[in-house]
Design a protein with these regions (language model features):
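Glycine-rich phosphate/pyrophosphate-binding loop and the adjoining helix
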Residues: 1, 121-141
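Short, solvent-exposed loop/turn segments at secondary-structure boundaries
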Residues: 16-19, 97-100, 132-134
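Structural beta-sheet core signal
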Residues: 6, 54, 85-89, 119
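Ser/Thr/Gly-rich flexible loops in soluble cytosolic domains mediating phosphotransfer, phosphorylation
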Residues: 80-101
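A short, flexible beta-alpha/helix-coil linker loop
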Residues: 11-12, 90-94, 125-127
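Internal catalytic-core helix/loop-beta-alpha segment
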Residues: 96, 107-108, 112-130
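N-terminal beta1-alpha1-beta2 submodule of the flavodoxin-like/Rossmannoid cofactor-binding fold
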Residues: 1-81, 112
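Charged helix-capping and loop-helix junction motifs
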Residues: 68-73, 99-105
Length: 141
């Protein structure tokens, strides 16, 4: 990977579990990375990035509405090469499979607009796991 843009797609951005997962990720990430809070909006220079990591909570079996303006801007960008899109999605349900519909939405978006697909991490019990004896599972390296 070259340069990574990490997009926090949570409506609670600075107070979210998505932010905490981003912090854990960055503790192990060795490359260059920038962060962007979708709820705050603002311009993005997509040409600077080889990879995008979308981190968001599950909202009604899909992506949060605050992430949609970012995706619309990304869809309208006609630059090349296209950054590879990765997803880390978490939910309060025990089963990480609950996140599958949201992942399919992002995969469909990538296919429709010509963005290469990267990796996916679907986390269940997202609200609970970070502050329990099982927290080691979320930040093992």
């Amino acid at each position: 990977m070259g340069r990574l843009l990490i997009v926090n797609g949570s409506p609670r951005a600075s107070r979210s579990n998505s932010r905490r997962y981003i912090e854990y990720f960055l503790q192990n990430w060795k490359g260059a990375a920038d962060q962007y809070a979708a709820v705050s909006g603002g311009p993005v220079s997509f040409e600077l990035y080889t990879d995008l990591l979308l981190v968001f909570p599950l909202y009604v079996d899909g992506v949060p509405a605050v992430l949609l303006p970012f995706l619309k801007t990304l869809a309208a960008w006609d630059g090349t090469p296209r950054p590879r899109v990765h997803v880390l999605v978490n939910c309060g349900f025990l089963e990480p499979e609950q996140n599958q519909v949201a992942v399919k939405m992002v995969r469909f978006f990538c296919k429709r607009y010509g963005f290469p697909w990267g990796m996916t991490l679907r986390i269940g019990s997202g609200e609970a796991i970070l502050d329990t004896p099982f927290a080691w599972f979320a930040h093992r390296g």
